[in-house]
UniProtKB/Swiss-Prot annotation:
Keywords: Host membrane, Membrane, Transmembrane, Transmembrane helix. The chain crosses the membrane at residues 49-69. It comes from the Viruses. It is a single-pass membrane protein. This is Uncharacterized protein 52. It comes from Sulfolobus islandicus filamentous virus (isolate Iceland/Hveragerdi) (SIFV). One of its GO terms (cellular component) is membrane. The lineage of its organism: Viruses, Adnaviria, Zilligvirae, Taleaviricota, Tokiviricetes. It is found in: Host membrane. Its main location: host cell.
Amino acid sequence: MSCSYEFIVDVNVCSTTYNRRYFHKFQLHSLVNTNVNVNKKYAYPSAGVDIVAVATTLPFIVAVICIVFDEVNVF
């Protein structure tokens, strides 16, 4: 797998303040774990939206998109 979180940052997909502050701390395996935990939360939804849970899922989604495009040689 040649696509990493450094690659995503390099192509400026993640350029928001949130991602500059936190995205570099994530690695793919921890993103997968975070996504699983968020899915468990949504299986038993509480009142309102868990903003932190949604925000921690975004880097995972971007990483998956990056990997998919890398596999089909779009970049």
